[in-house]
Amino acid sequence: VDISSTKSMTGHLLGGAGAFESMVCLLSMQNNVIPPTINLVNKDEDCDLNYTPNKSINKEVNISMSNSFGFGGHNGVLVFSKE
C-alpha cells in the first residue's frame, strides 16, 4: 500500500482539508498517479510503511482512502473505488 500526504504541499487546510483530500484521491485514481509527500528525507525506521517521498509514482490506482483526523476527536475516513 502506497502512503502519501498532501499536507506536505499545502499546509493544513482546516475545514477544507477533507474535501481537498477527497479531490486528490479521485484525481489520483483518474490519472493513475500517486502524489508525493514532499520534503520527506528522514523516515522513522520504526514506521515500516511504503511512503511516496518527494516524487510521484505512476501506477494503476483502483482504490484510494482519505483519513481526516480533526480537532476534538472528529474523525472521518472515505474510501473510493473505481468499481
List each language-model region with its residue ranges.
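Structural signature of cysteine-dependent C-C bond-forming condensing enzymes
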Residues: 1-9, 17-71, 81-83
